[in-house]
């Protein structure tokens, strides 16, 4: 019956069940053509098929007015869409040219395009009707070739199984998958396929090889991720609830005689627009409802296409490229290494726009088009499968990819105009795969210890709240600043007892603020301020670093989301969780009553200690020592500071600096003196005023001002540098880091003196902090590249905490990796690509351990002296032979989050 229905489209019968068909069906019933075991079940569906045949006959009558070419073409599609009577799930597909005669075969091959699709190959046990249909199809194909109709695209739609219930369920699943493919494979003529989508699942072997070759020779690739509802990365909502469905790639073909320009995309044929036959391919990465063998074949070819995309030498353009790379890594799964994406360079217009205007950190695609493109260009990003047809959605995606290409080229031209192209290409673009790899690797967390710590902190918070109510003489909401202000100053009058002339106020409040600086100034006058300070500290640890981490945990581990464009200084930022905000300094609390253990015993809690390395691995931390002070020394060129760093490296730079500043022997420098010097230095670096420094030091404002003046008088070149930075900002409206990063500061010309002073502080701060951020990013890139190039190292970069890089390393690789990391990072004082030559050496301190909160310093014997960066194995240049420290991993530290 299914054979009969399939052959209706070949005009063997235009009315259901003719006399000829009845005879054939009788022969089939006898068992010569059809298995008798399945005949009974097949006859049960006769009535349904008869209705389908009648309906199809009516459709044929309606089409008589159409041209002969369209009639023959659609008849052929109808035949192939209905399938064969007996098609094994293991049958494979062949090109349409396999059905052509020998004298027509060569001509048809030349007419095939990548958008050509597949037809099912017939089983060798096919019925007589199938053979007749095959001859009829051969006759039709000769007519089509004679009329120069080009390639014809067909698809498999029905598959027959012996068991009727199994056939029904599998056929429904396949029809659903085929219907989805129709949205991507426009069912019109082959020209329409070229203009819209080509699903790579429907390509034959010849077309697949042509696709790979086309990707290798492409002038540019424009990519976006598509979600199950039809939306893409180009939509306003960048975090859709729906899952990823596939990846769309618009391929810009190489112009005749043209050459790609991966290092300078704004040149040559790359600037030329797309032509009508530039293909748009669809790569499905969502699991499809077809049998495993074919699904695996589709996925394997999809991996090959994506792998070629990762290695492509032409410009690859993608909005939010980091998310695309992470999705590709997830699709590769266990079959792919993170090193497969290490060389990927994608042009991300959001990053380009952020370099031009750092204050606009998270613009949408539509925002960027409106801001940087011509007014006539419109963006269609709101169409989804829920409110538009698939063809409309797919057409919109193609048009938006063209707009994305044009936007990116315009932004690249602007980067060159602003002198930012080298920074974009050398520093920001290589970070994209690094951040994607970091997000794809989770860090293990000791969940049991974290839950225990949460309960302990919760009990301590309740005790502190009760103590606060007792010493205040009444109950109040301890987290309410207004109620606390009324208790401290309205009831207790502590501001009148303070020796300080004035305490900072908030807005127009009649009482001082309840900030940390004010509470520290009042802590010796009454027990309440001290209780409030401890309560806030414990509450922050519990809510942010314990309960917050528990909320982000999945399967006993966490993975932060890294934002490359989240700050104006160029620093990276993290969220869900903010791993950069987890303090390295432990806190001490008193054991709560009714808690296991001795009462009134001091516990030390380290939030970082809850992060533990995976089995067989160790954390390795590499920290730039005094990076911002070294940058300040380089920028200012102060002779005293240069002498401090250019001489033999000292054990404690800040102690030596204190000795220089206060003119006392190093042996007499106390810990308090050292900390005071450190805070003064960073007050200068960050542009903090005397008020903020006074709050940090816990001294009167006048004394803090004297510290600043004395320090700047000792190191006069620092003051000269600050004046030069401010003058440059007044002249150009922006400031620039040592690697060319710029920050516009329009308030530098404000009439309001307070706003203008703030902009001046930001100018000095940005030059130092932005330069340090650039150097840390450069360290990430060089170490990542060196590890990726190594045949032995497998270390994973798991976090960047500003001037610290955290790796997870296999235990036997710790010595080799530590040596490579130190040598690579310390060699960055000279970077030829950015024409950078620091006047001071860089120093990196290394530490390792099983827990992030309990890292121990690595002995100097583990690493060789600083030298030029190399990518080969450094195992021969470690410590002297026989040194036990050079052959053994650091001590194992499975320490709990609090040490008794």
UniProtKB/Swiss-Prot annotation:
Residues 60-90, 863-900 are annotated as: Disordered. It catalyses: DNA(n) + a 2'-deoxyribonucleoside 5'-triphosphate = DNA(n+1) + diphosphate. Pfam families: DNA_pol_A, DNA_pol_P_Exo. Its EC number is 2.7.7.7. SMART domains: POLAc. GO terms for biological process: DNA-templated DNA replication; double-strand break repair; double-strand break repair via homologous recombination; interstrand cross-link repair; translesion synthesis. Optimum pH is 8.8. It is found in: Nucleus. Gene3D superfamilies: 3.30.70.370, 5' to 3' exonuclease, C-terminal subdomain (1.10.150.20), Ribonuclease H-like superfamily/Ribonuclease H (3.30.420.10), Taq DNA Polymerase, Chain T, domain 4 (1.20.1060.10). Residues 60-75 have a biased composition (Basic and acidic residues). GO terms for cellular component: nucleoplasm; nucleus. Interacts with FANCD2, FANCI, PCNA, RAD51 and HELQ. This is DNA polymerase nu. The gene is POLN.
